[in-house]
Amino acid sequence: MHDKILILDFGSQVTQLIARRVREAHVYCEIHPNDVSDEFVREFAPKAVILSGSHASTYEDHQLRAPQAVWDLGVPVLGICYGMQTMAVQLGGKVEWSDHREFGYAEVRAHGHTRLLDGIEDFTTAEGHGMLKVWMSHGDKVAELPPGFKLMASTPSCPIAGMADEARGYYAVQFHPEVTHTVKGRQMLERFVLQIAGAKPDWIMRDHIEEAVAKIREQVGDEEVILGLSGGVDSSVAAALIHRAIGDQLTCVFVDHGLLRLNEGKMVLDMFEGRLHAKVVHIDASEQFLGHLAGVTDPEAKRKIIGREFVEVFQAEAKKLSNAKWLAQGTIYPDVIESGGAKTKKATTIKSHHNVGGLPETLGLKLLEPLRDLFKDEVRELGVALGLPPEMVYRHPFPGPGLGVRILGEVKREYADLLRRADAIFIEELRNTVATAQDAAAGLCGEADVGKSWYDLTSQAFAVFLPVKSVGVMGDGRTYDYVTALRAVQTTDFMTAHWAHLPYSLLGRVSNRIINEVRGINRAVYDISGKPPATIEWE
């Protein structure tokens, strides 16, 4: 049985980052709403509790509070931002409006010697004070410490930026250690979870396979399962895991909607039919999808059409498999959170996700989601442990609607063919080009990155088809052809992203190859927009 950390969500958009940091320390955790019952908290039996931030204020009429059981359990508790404020209020302290709100980078001074911050600092002042570079986002502040607490950190505008009652194992910080902007944040969370809470670091993906296989076998029994295989990381790992558990009881349905990457269908079939010997039904539905997309330019309308047609094609095939009782999906934890359907009802809906829908109800099937509690990095680890090739497992993210949302405006087969080839050239050059010492000296990458491919040094890279033409010259003749945009970003969590500073020589080579090898494109541009304000995908 794994030690568990209970994360109570008060509505922060970055609560899942807390969970990711805890999992990265190889400790299992779950996110639940802050208003779960005392009985639930006791039955969960956490090794420690973490209280998240929130957009709310402790002054609102319906203040969000932690269950009383949190304080009665006798386990360590860490409050983050709003979590610190509710800890203060519930334990006898005082919170008030702050005249100096803090949003963004801040430098926090550590006070005293606490187990949480001891020895953790980013720099030392001339006076010898240890300082931390952190990320703040708050409007209220703790004005009076609760009985038994001592000051742990401060800023000029927030005199109580951290507090601790070490006798009870209660710690709280006004900043966000879970975000990458807090330089030593991961170290703080690891110390709380591993040293203060004493949780065992035994949440390891290669060991998780045995548990997951046993759970799938227990759920499914001798019944059959159908799974929509997209070629993406999530559905591929789900298929490999389920096949490991039940073998030929699984049938994978691979729908080619005409909007896949170059040679993607062949790669998927070679992997699952050839290497894993799984049952795969391959359906070429490109004519159907492209026909319904004709004349449609609105991005959301395109997404809905692609989703609707996939359901229609998948349903038709599923009905032929009359013995199937389960529908398997590659849903992962962020999908569930972003769809507002996580174990926490406080999560704000960001977008509708293509994996979370009504298919099980319309088909009358039970739902099997073996990756539902895993983050993307854990899914990748699991895939490698299952024997999937790294080039499949560590592929960059690809949207559910495929190239349909990387072709701006109307989708046509001609556009998809041009984009497929341009994108393949971009990815090939990224894979084949390694970072050099000169790149590091120019500040394009770190010294530790020298020798790594630029594909591995970017988090997501792709080409976009622009439905506009520009004038060019090739040979002695005038051309009037389409434009492609190249997009490459670097990010740790995909919530924010920086555009990748690729070497000019690499970009020049990609542009030259696309213009010379893809007849119909005569210009390539590079997108240098960050997120925010831009999103990573163009549509």
Swiss-Prot record:
Entry's transmembrane regions: none
Pathway(s) it belongs to: Purine metabolism; GMP biosynthesis; GMP from XMP (L-Gln route): step 1/1
The EC number(s) this enzyme carries: 6.3.5.2
Keywords: ATP-binding, Glutamine amidotransferase, GMP biosynthesis, Ligase, Nucleotide-binding, Purine biosynthesis
Catalytic activity: XMP + L-glutamine + ATP + H2O = GMP + L-glutamate + AMP + diphosphate + 2 H(+)
Domain Glutamine amidotransferase type-1: 4-202
InterPro entries: Class_I_gatase-like, GATASE, GMP_synth_C, GMP_synth_GATase, GMP_synthase, GMPS_ATP_PPase_dom, NAD/GMP_synthase, Rossmann-like_a/b/a_fold
Residues binding ATP, per UniProt: 230-236
Any one cellular-component term (Gene Ontology): cytosol
CDD domains tied to this protein: GATase1_GMP_Synthase, GMP_synthase_C
Pfam families: GATase, GMP_synt_C, NAD_synthase
Residues in GMPS ATP-PPase domain copies: 203-395
Active site, per annotation: 81 (nucleophile), 176, 178
Molecular-function GO term, any one: ATP binding
Subunit: Homodimer.
Function: Catalyzes the synthesis of GMP from XMP.
Official protein name in the record: GMP synthase [glutamine-hydrolyzing]
